[in-house]
Amino acid sequence: MGGQFDLTLTDIPYGEVNRSSNGLRNLDKEDADILTFNLQDFLKKIYEVTKSTIIIFCGKEQMSEIHKFFSEKQKKGKGTVRQLVWKKTNPSPMNGQNIYLSGIENAVWFKKRGGTFNAHCKNTVFEYPCGRNKLHPTEKNHELLRELIRDNSNEGDIVFDPCCGSGAHCLVAKEENRNYIGVELKNQYYEIAKERLQ
């Protein structure tokens, strides 16, 4: 299968993403990371460095491009792609007085052929509340992360998060006896992650 990391589990920036159309799209998610990167280059590199499974939380605007990338791999017999949905049991009412509340977050899941999957006949919809004591504005529910890590890796495996934020994915990986590597560009969040992982 190749690659250095058993599981890549990440939450990419929902800010500005340089899309394959060579245009810059402002995805406008308040308080999200603002970082410009080339999504196609990112996907190619993540695919290359991951041995088994890739899970990418993303904005709805990024979903189709990410899903298409992995669908092409699936067509070539290199793995299986699915859309995962985190259904929030307590969505934030922010700006929801006169519109529907956004009660879900999307992720794309891709398992390389022969990769680890410790669940059986599991649904792609996960129901968990939003965390209220977050150290990063887009931090995911730790029990959701725990379920994903247990389903898609084994103890002693390496979990990689190239968009580490405040280190929640790494923290849960550590709690589940996985090794972890996290990368974060913003010094403020790097320091938070370093402290919580000590």
Predicted segments, located by residue:
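Short, conserved SAM-binding/catalytic segment
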Residues: 194-198
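Core catalytic lobe of class I
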Residues: 1-182, 186-191
